[in-house]
């Protein structure tokens, strides 16, 4: 729980994490769910699970999984003595359906922190800020300024314009919300032609402001084989630094 001040009154905020891990590794050319791929002798999903498990302000974790992979997740959870993973729910046909399935089993939480299981290098700081700004603004996400120049092209592949990076954000997770706001949002009828790519897109569509705070460039999503190479090197260097301090 988190102790927060709202309008001069101090209260405890109960915080629940949803980790979405029901995806595939198709873009990487693997037949298995990419969150089970090992980096640094641990499956990708274990990194984010451990980060939320060890965060003092996270009260419970709901994991979203494919039905035929639940036993694999249970093995990881039990063998690492994780106590905060209270429920594993089956994912839906879309990410939005998966999040709804997780939200439906959460009781009495003030803030929900939603994270992609394929982002192993989440930090306590990103989680803490997500909880803080969700309590303050209702909806928030972390993100980083793109390093490359971003341009818009036309249908014939000619550049139309260059965009100002000062106003561009590469959105990451976690994305954090007051529970009531995100629950009501997901239960709102949405035009099927509207492309809802993440939970902040839903908030935008419904007219809610979403606060953006600084993410971390290391908080990558493992999507390609190149991402996997970077992740392996990052873990090696992190372990080398840690070993040099002990």
UniProtKB/Swiss-Prot annotation:
Designated name of the protein: 2-C-methyl-D-erythritol 4-phosphate cytidylyltransferase
NCBIfam families referenced in this protein's UniProt entry, alphabetically: ispD (TIGR00453)
Pfam family membership, one: IspD
InterPro entries: IspD, IspD/TarI, IspD/TarI_cytidylyltransf_bact, ISPD_synthase_CS, Nucleotide-diphossugar_trans
CDD domains: CDP-ME_synthetase
Site-annotated residues for Positions MEP for the nucleophilic attack: 165, 221
Keyword Nucleotidyltransferase: yes
Site (Transition state stabilizer) residue list: 27, 34
Biological role stated in the UniProt entry: Catalyzes the formation of 4-diphosphocytidyl-2-C-methyl-D-erythritol from CTP and 2-C-methyl-D-erythritol 4-phosphate (MEP).
Pathway as given in its UniProt record: Isoprenoid biosynthesis; isopentenyl diphosphate biosynthesis via DXP pathway; isopentenyl diphosphate from 1-deoxy-D-xylulose 5-phosphate: step 2/6
Gene Ontology process terms (BP): isopentenyl diphosphate biosynthetic process, methylerythritol 4-phosphate pathway
């Amino acid at each position: 729980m988190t102790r927060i001040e709202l309008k001069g009154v101090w209260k405890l905020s109960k915080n629940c994490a949803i980790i979405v891990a029901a995806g595939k590794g198709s873009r990487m050319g693997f037949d298995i769910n990419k969150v089970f791929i090992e980096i640094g002798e641990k499956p990708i999903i274990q990194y984010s699970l451990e980060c939320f498990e060890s965060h003092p302000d996270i009260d419970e974790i709901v994991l979203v999984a494919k039905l035929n992979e639940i036993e694999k997740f249970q093995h990881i959870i039990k063998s690492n003595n994780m106590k905060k993973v209270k429920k594993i729910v089956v994912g839906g046909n879309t990410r939005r359906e998966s999040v709804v399935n997780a939200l439906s089993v959460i009781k009495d939480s003030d803030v929900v922190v939603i994270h992609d299981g394929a982002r192993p290098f989440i930090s306590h700081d990103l989680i803490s800020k997500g909880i803080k700004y969700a309590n303050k603004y209702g909806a928030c996400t972390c993100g980083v300024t793109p390093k490359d120049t971003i341009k818009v092209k036309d249908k014939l592949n000619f550049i139309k314009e260059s965009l100002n990076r000062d106003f561009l954000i590469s959105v990451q997770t976690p994305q954090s919300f007051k529970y009531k706001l995100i629950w009501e949002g997901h239960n709102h009828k949405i035009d099927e032609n509207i492309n809802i790519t993440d939970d902040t897109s839903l908030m935008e569509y419904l007219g809610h402001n979403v606060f953006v705070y600084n993410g971390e460039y290391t908080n990558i999503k493992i999507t390609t084989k190149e991402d996997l190479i970077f992740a392996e090197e990052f873990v090696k260097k992190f372990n080398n630094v840690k070993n040099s301090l002990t």
